[in-house]
Amino acid sequence: MRIAFLGTPAPAVPTLRALVANGHEVVIVVTRPDKKRGRGGELSPSPVKAAALELGLNVSHTLKDLYNVDAELGVVVAYGAMIPAAMLEVVPMLNVHFSLLPRWRGAAPVERAILSGDKETGVCIMTLEEALDTGPVHLEQRISIGEKTSSELLDELSILGAKALCEVVGSEELLKNADPQVGEPTYAEKLNSETFNLKNTESATQLARIVRLGRAFTFIGERRFKVLEAHALEHQGEPGTFTVVGGTPALVTSEGALALDVVQPEGSKSMAGSAWWLGAHLEPSSAHWG
């Protein structure tokens, strides 16, 4: 099948590679423009563009190029922008969405599932419509979330999504048949810096979920303090103070305490929370965070 692929970040790459490996003719790859990345600020391609060039595929940054390739089907995986309705008239499109629709339509479905304490998530292969993630579903696959980080979950979902997409594309029955989404929709709003700010008014369980997203931080005094790995403990104490359990420091919250397994103080490398605590010379009851 002649396929146009639209995608940008790393989780989209397994689907692109799977389509090629399964013998489909990827006639064009449309991805977002090169961006400045890293400390040097040099322009670098998106992960999808890098993979497409490695595979010898035709790459474009312009959706209008879809008019010129005579594709039979479009496949969209985290493209990073809305697809205009006019483009959906050029070629029918399938979208690989990393949630169990209609739950978590939108930009950050994996992270919102973790933050909400969902027990499971999954992948839906859906027909792309003009409205946001509303199309009928051709195939759904489920996985448990457990204590996985967002990075671990995305890695797993990207592989699952690639297999599911190829199953749909390879089956005339699955391609022709799709079920309307059933249930109350929820929306996965974009994350911002405040999403990752650990506050002592939250429960330890909720803070542990935030840590699993990566980028979690708080403040000790006026210094920014990153929390890389942590887990929730049962504890009663004054929120905003510290406690120590088995040599590991923990942030006392409104409900329980957050044990600091791996941290990165401002201006330092990452280290075990216990090692940081030994060198910090803080008093648990008088030191404050948040």
Give the location of each predicted region.
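Short alpha-helical
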Residues: 10-11, 82, 132, 225
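Structural motif
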Residues: 8-9, 195
